[in-house]
């Protein structure tokens, strides 16, 4: 079992948990994720690691309360324990110096984007971050992003903060003013779908970090399978990052919606 060291509310249904996991903290890299379970009969939920402190032996997770299991995690407090925490899983982000990198995050996807932003910036890239949220209250980790990038562009659906518009508007504004060598996108599948469609038009290599339904995290169950370039891939072992222009997002969206009625219970 893993103890929760601290808890912070980003909004009414989004929390940040700092969890004791010294082995994971030492070995994790940008892009890695863990699978979390609360209670012996709880659902196994994949969560990308948003940060780690090797000195304290902790990792940071950001969770949005959507279904029953994620709500249970969000209800935990400092001092409580997570029943199972497995990781680090998946393939780490390929980090190299490529030039200008645009990192686009929507919603809670901003959290796992942070270590990727940090890694690309440390590698000597010019990193521009586009943060998107519905309203000002839902914008998270802006300060941390500014500390680890060259520029941060904030987009809100209602214009209550930053610039009114969608994440794609922010990304395109950068493309229109300077050469972009790589785009990394994380967030809801529909957000990544439209970011991918935009960058494909401009022939900009793009990586999408996918968060699909998972059970075992080893590729055995096949719950996380997706189609990439016409071939079946498993997000838990082959990903979570893929060439966004090759991902069948429509299929992914259909699979993600398969259990929505059950998740509401």
Model-derived regions: residue spans:
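Short, surface-exposed secondary-structure boundary micro-motifs
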Residues: 39, 87-88, 229
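Short, Lys/Arg- and Gly-enriched loop/turn segments at beta-strand edges
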Residues: 42-50, 89-99, 236
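Local cysteine-cluster metal-coordination motifs and their immediate loop/turn environment
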Residues: 112, 189, 211-241
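FNR/FR-type flavoprotein reductase catalytic core
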Residues: 71-215
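A generic structural signal for residues embedded in beta-strands
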Residues: 36, 84-85, 226
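Structural signal for conserved beta-strand scaffold positions within catalytic alpha/beta enzyme cores
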Residues: 6, 51, 154-156, 208, ...
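Ferredoxin-reductase
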Residues: 1-80
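Short Fe-S-cluster ligation motifs
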Residues: 234-238, 242-265
């Amino acid at each position: 079992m893993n103890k929760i060291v601290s808890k912070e509310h980003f909004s009414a249904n989004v929390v940040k948990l700092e969890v004791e996991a010294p082995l994971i903290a030492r070995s994790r890299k940008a892009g890695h994720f863990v699978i979390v379970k609360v209670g012996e009969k709880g659902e196994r939920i994949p969560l990308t690691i948003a940060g780690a402190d090797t000195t304290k032996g902790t990792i940071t997770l950001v969770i949005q309360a959507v279904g029953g299991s994620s709500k249970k995690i969000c209800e935990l407090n400092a001092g409580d324990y997570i029943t199972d925490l497995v990781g680090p899983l998946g393939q780490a982000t390929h980090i190299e110096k490529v030039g200008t990198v645009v990192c686009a995050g929507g919603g809670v996807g901003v959290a796992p984007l942070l270590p990727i932003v940090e890694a690309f910036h440390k590698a000597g890239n010019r990193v521009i971050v586009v943060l998107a949220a519905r309203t000002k209250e839902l914008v998270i980790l802006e300060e941390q992003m500014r500390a680890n990038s060259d520029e941060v562009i904030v987009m809100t659906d209602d214009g209550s903060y930053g610039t009114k518009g969608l994440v794609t508007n922010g990304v395109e504004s950068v493309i229109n003013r300077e050469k972009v060598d790589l785009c990394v996108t994380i967030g809801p599948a529909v957000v990544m779908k439209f970011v991918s469609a935009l960058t494909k038009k401009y022939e900009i290599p793009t990586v999408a970090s996918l968060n699909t339904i998972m059970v075992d995290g080893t590729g055995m169950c096949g719950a996380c399978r997706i189609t990439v370039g016409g071939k079946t891939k498993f997000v838990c072992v082959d990903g979570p990052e893929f060439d966004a222009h090759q991902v069948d997002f429509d299929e992914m969206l259909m699979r993600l919606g398969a259990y929505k009625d059950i998740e509401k219970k």
